[in-house]
Swiss-Prot record:
It is found in: Cytoplasm. GO terms for cellular component: cytoplasm; plasma membrane. This is Chromosomal replication initiator protein DnaA. Disulfide bonds: none annotated. NCBIfam families: DnaA. Residues 1-75 are annotated as: Domain I, interacts with DnaA modulators. The keyword Endoplasmic reticulum does not apply. Residues 105-322 are annotated as: Domain III, AAA+ region. Residues 75-104 are annotated as: Domain II. Belongs to the DnaA family. Keywords: ATP-binding, Cytoplasm, DNA replication, DNA-binding, Lipid-binding, Nucleotide-binding.
Length: 442
């Protein structure tokens, strides 16, 4: 099928080459009409693809093929694929079939119990727990979790949905990616079934929608979601949404929809700090039954700074190679196995990128940021940039000083300590820091 090569090409641009070669290139795609089956040579690859890549594959295939229903199987693609027979009930009474299915759309693996809490996500975790315990409460309805990709927003959303179902097994909890909402609406329009589409959403107890930034520019989709939102909100049904940025920053979203999204609670999920990253690596290793020494977890946490998905990718690559080779996981083995991945991560966030991002954020010229002038409007952003360089790169203090117009390493050390101290009392500076971390991690 044509869509799979295009999907694979996009995945190659988003994930490390070694991961693509190990987990994605072996897959064979079969289009069965109502779904797409991806065949893997063994169950281990199926497990890795399901855990790490399946949500993104579904998004891309929905975009390229108009079909985000994807199944994984062990084996090889049949030479003469036959479409799956339609269930008799659907064939005889198509109008009775739900436009958007309820069953199986929540991943039960994601719970609050296996979510690793840290300073960067503790407010989001607390809000998701409250939404699950008191669904529909105006204090957190809607609950909007926003932040860069791979930080755990979907995990918290799934965990809240699973907790709702555990408390009330009869609860109708619907999880959708934004593209699925769009596709279901288009299908309802084509089938002249908009009344059924609207009625189905009115019958649920909680609606969870991922990546609402993709509603931008789709006027009819926003119109229908606006009315769906109002009906659920008025009925005190819980709404949980995720977005890759604060909704007011999303161009193409209607002002009235942005206003609705601000009614409840909006929480930023930030990149995890070092301690949280290390805890995540160790927790994910335990889930896989893998023995990971602390110093290896610290190595991965120190080098992989951007998001949880990258941490998991590094861990999975490490465990897979250890299984294939029979070697023990040591620091030396980790450095050897993850060499290209770590190099790419290091190159992604360099001092010039940090300087430009900070200068743009504070509305400064680069020459002013690097100048010898010490006015407060320049000194504070300069200190922030130095502290970010120390936090996000492997450069030494003298190297960072050289990059800032030849400043002494003691100046850099003072800047790092000053920013760390000020952030404890200055909420605005803490907010600036977290926003810059998010921008540099995108």
């Amino acid at each position: 099928m044509d869509a799979w090569p295009r999907c694979l090409e996009r995945l190659e641009a988003e994930f490390p080459p070694e991961d693509v070669h190990t987990w994605l290139k072996p897959l064979q795609a079969e289009d069965r009409g109502d779904s797409i089956v991806l065949y893997a040579p063994n169950a281990f690859i199926v497990e890795q693809v399901r855990e790490r890549y399946l949500p993104r594959i579904r998004e891309l295939l929905a975009y390229f093929a108009g079909n985000g229903e994807v199944a994984l199987a062990v084996g090889s693609r049949p030479r003469a694929p036959e479409p799956l027979p339609a269930p008799q009930a659907v064939a005889s009474a198509p109008a009775a079939a739900p436009i958007v299915p309820f069953a199986g759309n929540l991943d039960s693996h994601y719970t609050f119990a296996n979510f690793v809490e840290g300073r960067s996500n503790q407010l989001g975790l607390a809000a998701a727990i409250q939404a699950a315990q008191k669904p529909g409460d105006r204090a957190h309805n809607p609950l909007l979790l926003y932040g860069s990709t791979g930080l755990g927003k979907t995990h918290l959303m799934f965990a809240a949905g699973n907790a709702l179902r555990q408390a009330n097994p009869a609860a109708k909890v619907m999880y959708l990616r934004s593209e699925q909402f769009f596709s279901a609406m288009i299908r309802a329009l084509q089938d002249k079934a908009m009344d059924q589409f609207k009625r189905q959403f009115q019958q649920i107890d909680a609606l969870l929608i991922d990546d609402i930034q993709f509603f931008a520019g789709k006027d009819r989709t926003q119109e229908e979601f606006f009315h769906t939102f109002n009906a659920l909100f008025d009925g005190r049904q819980q709404i949980i949404l995720t977005c890759d940025r604060y909704p007011r920053e999303v161009e193409g979203l209607e002002p009235r929809l942005k206003s609705r999204l601000a009614w409840g609670l909006s929480v930023a999920i930030d990149p995890p700090d070092f301690e949280t990253r290390a805890a995540i690596v160790l927790a994910k290793a335990r889930e896989r039954g893998a023995e990971i020494p602390d110093d290896v977890a610290f190595l991965i946490a120190k080098k992989m700074r951007s998001n949880v998905r990258d941490l998991e990718g590094a861990l999975n690559t490490l465990v897979a190679r250890a299984n294939f080779t029979g070697r023990s996981i040591t620091v030396e083995f980790a450095q050897e196995t993850l060499r290209d991945l770590l190099r790419a991560q290091q190159q992604a966030i360099g001092i010039p990128n940090i300087q430009k991002t900070v200068a743009d954020y504070y509305g400064l010229q680069m020459k002013d940021l690097l100048s010898k002038r010490r006015t407060r409007s320049l000194a504070r952003p300069r200190q922030v940039a130095m502290a970010l360089a120390k936090e996000l790169t492997e450069h030494s203090l003298p190297e960072i000083g050289d990059a800032f117009a030849g400043r002494d390493h003691t100046t850099v050390l003072h800047a790092c300590r000053q920013i760390r101290t000020l952030m404890e009392a200055d909420g605005k500076l803490r907010e600036d820091w977290e926003k810059l971390i998010r921008k540099l991690s995108e």
